[in-house]
Amino acid sequence: MIQAENPLQEEKTERKMLNEIITSDASTDDLLKAIGHREDCRRDMSDAEIITTAITAAMFFNGNHSAACSYMKDHNLMPQMLEKSRFNRRLHNVSILIHDLFHQVGMILKESSGCTEYLLDSFPIPMCDNIRIFNVKLIKSEDYRGYIASKKRYFYGIRVQLLTTKSGIPVEFVFMPGSANDVRALNALPLNLPAGSEVYADGAYTDYTAEDDLKFTEQITLQVMRKKNSKRKDKPWNQYIKQSIRHYIETVFSAITCLFPKSIHAVTYDGFLLKVEAFIFAFTLKQAFIE
């Protein structure tokens, strides 16, 4: 016999969800003001409300914008909610703005947390299973066919290069094709960090030239896990410290990807990236301002 859910527990969960949505909306509005954003006051929905709805979709509805729009309207959180096609157009129009807001949060965390240790790694996001590559309509390029060594399987999609604080809050990210190795992505990240920062990464980021350049020009130390044949071997205790510090980023990846649906539905490649960015931004806001 299946027991009915506790009404008090349902009410508590609902209240917590509403509080997180309201906090996200307030945080988004404050961030937009901080970057001096202005918009047309004649619009039915503000950019902050559009972005908050996308964040709500990522946090609670597996990225389903239609479900999030209905929830926001039904609970009178966004009474002037746009219909589906208009909402999607507005959301695509603010995609760069979402990116700017993420980096604004990253800058705040870098400057205010006093953090000097950061974690760097990548995780794959498939657009489809490898056997269905020929049916993909979002993009067609062999550059997006990558390999997941831990699972010993190929995938077709992108890699997210993610830089987080030591406590696991994302501060920088970049999207790369699935086949891109980590050294290539290292050169794509801005790594706009305070002098004296240390970035912990696995052995796939081994690039002595980039390592020396960062140390000399930016005073940033790249703490890479050394391979057995490395020219710059670590002492055993240094290797242990690096491993214990960088291991936490795997937990961050799990926390972000657990919000994903089984497959991310998108009509265009830009729409796919926008949804992934919303998942990352939602996780960042929750870690930085809500929890």
Label each residue range with its predicted role:
Residues 1-291:
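Short alpha-helical elements
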